[in-house]
Amino acid sequence: MESRVLFSSQFNFPVNSPFKTRETSIAPLTPSRNVLSFSFRSPAERCAMRIVPLVKAASSTPQIVAEVDGSSHEPRRKKLAVFVSGGGSNFRKIHEGCSDGSVNGDVVLLVTNKKDCGGAEYARSNGIPVLVFPKAKREPSDGLSPSELVDVLRKYGVDFVLLAGYLKLIPVELVQAFPKRILNIHPALLPAFGGKGLYGIKVHKAVLESGARYSGPTIHFVNEEYDTGRILAQSAVRVIANDTPEELAKRVLHEEHKLYVEVVGAICEERIKWREDGVPLIQNKQNPDEYY
C-alpha cells in the first residue's frame, strides 16, 4: 500500500500533528486541534501525514515572505519551458494538466539534449517548439549555447523552467537568469540517493540496496549542483520487502505524475512562499493560512 505526503524542507519522521502559520504573523506555529493521536496510526498512515518543519520559540520563528505583488487579481497564465532527455512522461502529464485546467499555465517550449527522444516527438505532435541544448559535439549547429538558451527563454517570456527527466547539468547562466524559477523532480527522497550519476533505475537499485523502508519523488528548486537545491515537496512510497528496482520505479513514477502536476499548479497560482530562513512552502489553496 502506498502513502502520499507533501513535505516542505527536508524529509523528516512524522510528528503528531500538522502545523500551520500565518503569512502576516511571527507567532509560533500552532498544532491543529482535530488531529488523531500519532500513536494510533500505522507506519504508512504516520508517513502520510502532512507536516511542515517544527519551529521553536516565537523570538526565533522565521516569517513567511510572499514573493508576489500583493494584488488581489487572479494570477495570469504562466509560460512554462520543460526540459527532457527521454520519453517525457512527466512532461506529458504537465501538458495534460495545462489542457484540463489543473495548471494555470501553458508549455511554450520543450528543451532536450536528444532531439529524437519521445518527449520531443510528443512536443512536435502537439505544436510545441523543440530546442536542442547543449550543442551536440558531432552536430554543434543543432544546439544552443547557454547564453543563446537564456535569450530564447526570455524571448518566449518563460516564467518557470521545469526539468522532467533532463540528465544534463543546468548551466550557471540559466540558474542566475531564473532564480527560484527552476524546478526538478528526482525519483528518491532527497537528500538521500541524489547527485551526479544517480538517475533512473540506478536510484531505485541504490534505495533497495540500502534497506530504506520508504522512497518516493522529490521536487526541488535547482541550483548549480545536482539535486542540492531547496526541497519543495516529496511523496512517500513504501518499499515492499520483495521489491525489484523496476517495480519500485513504477510505483514512484506513478506518484511523480501526480505530485509534479500538483506542485506546478501551485507555482502557477503563486502559492509558493518563502520563509526568512530560505525554506519554500506551499500555501493551501482552500485554507490560505495553512502551509505545507
UniProtKB/Swiss-Prot annotation:
EC class (word): transferase
Main location per the UniProt record: plastid
> Active-site residues?
H186
Record pathway: Purine metabolism; IMP biosynthesis via de novo pathway; N(2)-formyl-N(1)-(5-phospho-D-ribosyl)glycinamide from N(1)-(5-phospho-D-ribosyl)glycinamide (10-formyl THF route): step 1/1
Q: Name one GO biological process term.
A: 'de novo' IMP biosynthetic process
Q: Where in the cell is it found?
A: Plastid, Chloroplast
Q: Where is the transit peptide?
A: 1-65
Might you report a single GO cellular component term? chloroplast
Q: Which UniProt keywords apply?
A: Chloroplast, Plastid, Purine biosynthesis, Transferase, Transit peptide
The residues listed in the UniProt record as binding N(1)-(5-phospho-beta-D-ribosyl)glycinamide, with positions renumbered to this chain, are G88, S89, N90, E256
Q: So where does (6R)-10-formyltetrahydrofolate get bound?
A: L167, K168, L169, I170, N184, D227
Q: Which domain of life is it from?
A: Eukaryota
Per the UniProt record, one Pfam family is: Formyl_trans_N
Task: Name the PROSITE patterns for this protein.
Answer: GART (PS00373)
- Look up the EC number in the record and give it: 2.1.2.2
- Please report the name of this protein according to its UniProt entry: Phosphoribosylglycinamide formyltransferase, chloroplastic
Organism the protein comes from: Arabidopsis thaliana (Mouse-ear cress)
